[in-house]
């Protein structure tokens, strides 16, 4: 879980636009963020395996 202080700090608008960093809205994780799903890899895996993300299926080959 992300630190509450860092989550609050990231919600403020930065002085420069390039300083903005994507965070997972579920857990607040700043790294391993998937733009397509708007969440981190850990939450993506959890929700995909539970079947809560439409169109995502487990692949096998």
Swiss-Prot record:
Family in the record: Belongs to the universal ribosomal protein uS14 family. Zinc-binding uS14 subfamily.
GO cellular component, one term: small ribosomal subunit
Cofactor: Zn(2+)
Gene: rpsZ
UniProt cofactor note: Binds 1 zinc ion per subunit.
Single GO term (MF): zinc ion binding
Key words, A-Z: Metal-binding, Ribonucleoprotein, Ribosomal protein, RNA-binding, rRNA-binding, Zinc
Protein name, as recorded: Small ribosomal subunit protein uS14
Highest taxon above the source species: Bacteria
């Amino acid at each position: 879980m992300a630190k509450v202080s860092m989550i609050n700090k990231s919600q403020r608008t930065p002085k420069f636009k390039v300083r903005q960093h994507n965070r997972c809205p579920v857990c607040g994780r700043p790294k391993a963020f998937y733009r397509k799903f708007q969440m981190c890899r850990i939450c993506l895996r959890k929700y995909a395996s539970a079947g809560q993300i439409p169109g995502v299926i487990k692949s096998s080959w």
